[in-house]
Amino acid sequence: MNVGELVRDSLREQAAEQPPLGPGFADRVLTARRRRRNRSIATVAAATAAVVAVAVAVPLLDSGKHEVRLATEMNRSDIIAHPDQSPPRDLIAAGDVALAGYYTLDTVKTSKDTAVRTRAYHILDQETGKYVKDTRWSQISVAPGMRTAAVLEKDLPARRIGLLDLLTGDIERWISVDRGVAAVSFSSDGARLVATTYSKNPDELTKASNDVDGDGTKNDFVPQFSESYRTGFYLVDVDSGRTKWSETPPEKDDELAIVNSRQDFSFSGDGTLVRSGLAVEPHDQYYDFQGNKVAKPANEKYLTWSVQARLSPDGKLAAGRFAGGARTTGSEIIDPYTGKRLHKVRGQQLLTWVDNERLIAWDIKPGDNEFHSALVLVTIGSDTTLRLSGALKGNDGAPGRWNPVFATR
């Protein structure tokens, strides 16, 4: 029997063993999570790698279809870096985390005294492994496994949530809602979404009475800091499309809003609560699924919404605040239960955990402009960083500065 016959027999066996694909999106996400857990079985994988590699683009003989593989699956390298690219053009990843996309901000005038802050997204094309501009969406959240993203259309608040196929670029299906939604966020298992509802577009701006950016002209637009139009949140079962809305009380202190005009909800670490930031202490507020305020979970008591990385995968460590000096950068790693500093790592701002010892952060080169940050990989117990992207250009708020969107691959 020659090599071609061996491959064909192998494909027939694989096709016969595979159960029919169901329509459930959640099943696909869970499959992606199982693939990540099984990555450690390296010996068995190495023994079969040659056959799998040959079989990738070969049609399944019984079905006439091609096996689908994502760009994030084709390159399973621990670190995929492009330190010469800013904004990124090609896939960036470390460990189980990848840069799923990024967005830039722009201010679009709607009248003499009003404007709206808009986002322009570049999303990873899972067919080519490149970041491609997609102007259709105002908000994006990428599911674990990076096959699907939840999206909102440009006009906010939106009355439907789209599930975008990141391989084809097409909408898989729409989930309609009765109340306007302006943000979406996946749970860590990809089975649910929390969608924040607003009565008005939270990205609307008004003309400032002073010269905010110091350029000598009074042409700046700012959010309405004293007002919040947030009304509550939907819990969305992704597989069935069922939704449940809960109202949340206004967050005010002496009749002034203590949340930003856009202050979106996300899930707690274990997915049993939802949370959002506050502009004042205690900096985070948690809610049960009925919209009632509850105490912070014990292992999230010392977290703050301004530090994006939050808990390590095993829950034993938490990302802390900036801990650098006048000429050095650094950030804390703390005990999530006590708030005590356990470690100090490089980095201006900790963005996401890669594993239990490594994180992706914004950081600058020694002596560089504080706004010229690049994505870097930092490791607990090491002063060495590995640059993953090129550096941002311009100062804070300058056109073209990009903001990363991460997801597990």
Identify what each model region corresponds to.
Residues 86, 135-137, 179-181, 260-262, ...:
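Loop/turn position at the start of each blade in beta-propeller repeats
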Residues 52-150, 154, 355:
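Non-cleavable N-terminal signal-anchor transmembrane helices
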Residues 69-82, 110-136, 158-177, 208-216, ...:
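Surface-exposed loop/turn elements that mediate protein-protein interactions on large endomembrane-trafficking
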Residues 269-315:
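Aromatic-anchored, glycine/proline-accented short structural segments
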Residues 154, 198-200, 277-279, 323, ...:
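Short loop/turn segments immediately following the C-termini of beta-strands
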Residues 94-113, 196-228, 365-367:
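Short, conserved, GDST-rich strand-edge loop motifs in beta-rich repeat architectures
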Residues 89-96, 139-149, 183-193, 264-273, ...:
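Blade-terminus and WD-like Trp-Asp/Gly-His loop motifs, strongest in beta-propeller folds
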Residues 1-76:
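N-terminal export/targeting signals for secretion/compartment entry
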